[in-house]
Amino acid sequence: MPTAGSKKKAPTPQISCLTSESYTQLDFLPDKLRTKLLPFQKDGIVFALRRDGRCMVADEMGLGKTIQAIAIAYFYKEEWPLLIVVPSSLRYPWIEELEKWIPELEPEEINVVMNKTDIGRIPGSRVTVLGYGLLTTDAETLLDALNTQNFRVVIVDESHYMKSRTAARSKILLPMVQKARRAILLTGTPALGRPEELFMQIEALFPQKFGTWIEYAKRYCNAHVRYFGKRRQWDCRGASNLSELHQLLNDIMIRRLKSEVLSQLPPKVRQRIPFDLPPAAVKELNASFEEWQKLMRAPNSGAMETVMGLITRMFKQTAIAKAGAVKDYIKMLLQNDSLKFLVFAHHLSMLQACTEAVIESKSRYIRIDGSVPSSERIHLVNQFQKDPDTRVAILSIQAAGQGLTFTAASHVVFAELYWDPGHIKQAEDRAHRIGQCSSVNIHYLIANGTLDSLMWAMLNRKAQVTGSTLNGRKEKLQATEDDKEKWGFLQFAEAWTPSDSFEELKDSVFTHFEKEKQHDIRSFFLPKLKKRQLETTCDDPEAFKEKITVASDPRKMATSDSTADKNGCEPEAKRLKSLSTEDHSSALEEGPSLQARATSMEVVHEVKPPLASPALPEKGWQCGFCTFLNNPGLPYCEMCENPRSRAAGRNHLQDNNKNDEDAAQESTSKSDQAGLECERQCPERLEAEQSANSKEEALEGGGEDRLPSQPEIGQLNNSGTLPVRETFMFCASRNTDRIHLYTKDGKPMNCNFIPLDIKLDLWEDLPATFQLKQNRSLILRFVREWSSLTAMKQRVLRKSGQLFCSPLLASEEITKQQAKENNTRRYITKEDVAKASMNKVKSDGGHIRLITKESMTQDSSLKKIDSACVPSLNPCPADLTVEPSPSKGYIQAVDKEGRPLCLRCQHPTCQPEQTAKASAWDSRFCSLKCQEEFWIRSNNSYLRAQVFATEHGVCQHCGVDAQELFLRMRDAPKSHRKSLLNAAWTAKLPLEQLNEMLRNPGEGHFWQVDHIRPVYEGGGQCSLDNLQTLCTVCHKERTAQQAKERSQVRRLSLATKHGSDITRFLVKK
């Protein structure tokens, strides 16, 4: 495929020609990117080009530094490969921006480094995205690969991460930036609190420009000798000659403030809310204050570590002391139903207190702290931005205080302060940035008599230093102090203490008297129900009783109908009758609301076993217009492209010789039951298909039904010049939701789109060619097929990186290509790996070694065996002379040339010269793909994490969000947990399991990873496409059903040994 660089020739930026013709030179940028740039952003690009692509863009947070850096790097694309170093939580947002603004980048050309051994795709990628967390001294394999690649263009986002001269990541990153020909540093806070934090960034861009470190420190950091006790220390934490430093920085740094370039942006209003605390709440804190004062008055102040440890303890005590008042303040804000706000805190105890306040107010929330994976943070941000019911975001200042966008919030609350103004301003501007439509009110909760007062004064002193250095004028955190009497109620807040003991749970657990309630005596006089008629509503036991009564009493059919409509379910008898006597359109009108059933927390669990996957007809379906027999997986007719009706999806095609009425009725009943199961499992899929169908019908219908945002199809002035395509090829991005377009010959069209945008009639990402009806219908057909796939199948298709015409056919082909060997063992063990390695050595020669995480290797004697053997990770015949059962590490094969072989596929992982540099532990796998497949098949925690990244803990059978309930249970006060479980879908679980959820809630109590094809049927050691998320209730029911089926199989097999089954004579032939 042609490379992106073959399209345009980048002009060589000359300093002399950028004075009057600078904006003209920006025409080199892609049209979509150029038109999106604001005037001040264009100035930033010109500033960088004048300095040959080496500068710092230090605009205030929220002014679009990312898009400026992408545009600057695009000018030098002939010099790529490009390295982008970002905080780990910002890797995927950066890739989204790259694919959005540079559509000529193909999915295979962007590489995200996932771990310290993921180096396989670095040499062949044009763009490599790397997280700061991987820049450690023990990442030798990764560092060697990065240095070998010789990146000519480097972007360092949030470059203030390099502030420390002694940090490992600063020492590693410094030579990489210095060696690159172009380097763009991005940060909204170059110095978080002191001028010393600027030196490493300046040194990376222009070595020795400001002299050596000693010279810089003496001149601008007021460096002097200071004594801590008897220890002599060089103190560089001061500031001096700031106006001179500001003038010198202007030559290498461009910085604009929102107040200067975005006058139309609503203002940011800071407000201090002081309040007093009751004496009982600050008792421990006062004792620490007295200890600190004694320590500072002593002639020898003692070790610095002792002083800093005491201050850290006081910081935490301040958080606990004011937590009760913060809870009351949050509850007060939640009384305004239209308010969405952010709450920032630092300590986990304060985050926990804020979360408890939201749960007690029965409001929906998100929480992002250091334990939340970076991929899940994007999902939570989207939830807060788009869901009107999610009203609160509880955020860690360090984990979520930079790089994320929360413009849906109009208020920001600081439950705690932090040590430097840089982090505070970064957190403020999560809401106050481009895209904000209302003024942002920022409230600082300041508890009098605590460390808050000292920290506020310190923040203002540091703000003056950073303001003079970066902006050329003294600044401070200007916040008006609100009326103290207005917030007087906070001083009467109940003290909050962390609930770590089990004493609170003595009266908050379930008992046998609560679980085994006395039954209604009238139930003994009612006929027993069949299993398919039993339905239980997890949240409403009364509704459960009502359904049983209605379903079992035929004299109350009228009441049954009304109840079914109200609860969103149809009785079995009514559903069978309507489907057998009415057409599909009337059935569609009478059907319940699928979306309501999917999103409601009152999920209906049936006693019958859950289906492993959506039920599809075995013999295909017949088009109602052209009568063509279609593949059962296609949602549209292959001949006439008519959308598949839901009636066709429910009914199997009957053979011509099957005219018996009873057989037909039985077939209809079974297929209808399967169709309803499919609806229950995949409501989003059906809704997406209906949405896509309606849009295509609108395109093909009359003029009044066409898309309002697009020109009239067939009446375009230049319609004759736009090419009409017979078909397109597609490639799904590995890391984002975007789909890249190719011609039928596999040539890139340099455009991409998000399927959800097409559903919402947003076509801006696609060129004018797609205004034509035929071209647009191809995209709509793709979106319809793509939406019909499960999230897991979409993920598998993305990771494959292949070109395809039809997502359904491509997914089916991937499933066929994957190994389908029967395996009744759940995981790969170390013994399996050892046997496979031994067999490889037997067949091909070489030797084996024991590798451990400590990088220790133990080589066994060389074994030259000529017998043939196919290496496999499946259990091999145990005919080995050596017992391969290492308690630690893995037995790995090494070939005759000294190359270690992959634990997964037994192919070489690296060359002999690379083996000497890399540790043995880092040479376990040949690629990231093999590594992921191995861990999925051998590590339960990794498997759960991968499934969670796709399905987010939502049950694929009943649609309940089990992860959300787990988070609420984990974060709720222990006294509230019982009421949460009583109102949730977990009421059917055993008493012991419910009480364990109360005492120590964990993810495994609420949702499980289930094998679609059971392990006992050969579905063990499988890939992700055979896994699904099930809530504990559904998983328990499915496990019970599978146990029953296995018992029946064993009983029948035992019976056949002594005679034939009599029931076989009753089966129709």
Curated annotation (Swiss-Prot):
Return the motif ranges for APIM motif: 1064-1068
Q: Where is the Helicase C-terminal domain?
A: 325-485
Q: Mark out the compositionally biased spans (Basic and acidic residues).
A: 652-661, 677-707
Record the organism.
Mus musculus (Mouse)
Question: Could you share any additional remarks the record makes about this protein?
Answer: In contrast to classical helicases that unwing DNA, annealing helicases rewind it.
What residues does the HNH domain cover?
1001-1041
Q: What is its EC number?
A: 3.6.4.-, 3.1.-.-
Coordinates of motif DEAH box in the sequence?
A: 157-160
**Any one GO molecular function term:** DNA endonuclease activity
Among InterPro entries, the record links this protein to: Helicase_ATP-bd, Helicase_C-like, HNH, HNH_nuc, P-loop_NTPase, SNF2-like_sf, SNF2/RAD54-like_C, SNF2_N
Its assembly, as annotated, is: Interacts (via PIP-box and RanBP2-type zinc finger) with PCNA (when PCNA is polyubiquitinated via 'Lys-63'-linked polyubiquitin).
Task: Summarize the protein's role.
Answer: DNA annealing helicase and endonuclease required to maintain genome stability at stalled or collapsed replication forks by facilitating fork restart and limiting inappropriate recombination that could occur during template switching events. Recruited to the sites of stalled DNA replication by polyubiquitinated PCNA and acts as a structure-specific endonuclease that cleaves the replication fork D-loop intermediate, generating an accessible 3'-OH group in the template of the leading strand, which is amenable to extension by DNA polymerase.
Locations listed in the record: Nucleus; Chromosome
Instruction: Extract the ranges annotated as region (Disordered).
Output: 648-720
RanBP2-type zinc finger segments:
617-646
**Chain location of the short sequence motif PIP-box per the record:** 518-525
The protein depicted here goes by the name DNA annealing helicase and endonuclease ZRANB3
Q: Name one GO biological process term.
A: response to UV
* Gene Ontology cellular component list: nuclear replication fork; nucleoplasm
Which residues are noted in the entry as ATP-binding? Answer: D59, E60, M61, G62, L63, G64, K65, T66
Mind listing the UniProt keywords for this protein, alphabetically? ATP-binding, Chromosome, DNA damage, DNA repair, Endonuclease, Helicase, Hydrolase, Metal-binding, Multifunctional enzyme, Nuclease, Nucleotide-binding, Nucleus, Zinc, Zinc-finger
- Residue stretches making up the Helicase ATP-binding domain: 46-208
Task: Note whether ATP-binding occurs among the keywords.
Answer: yes
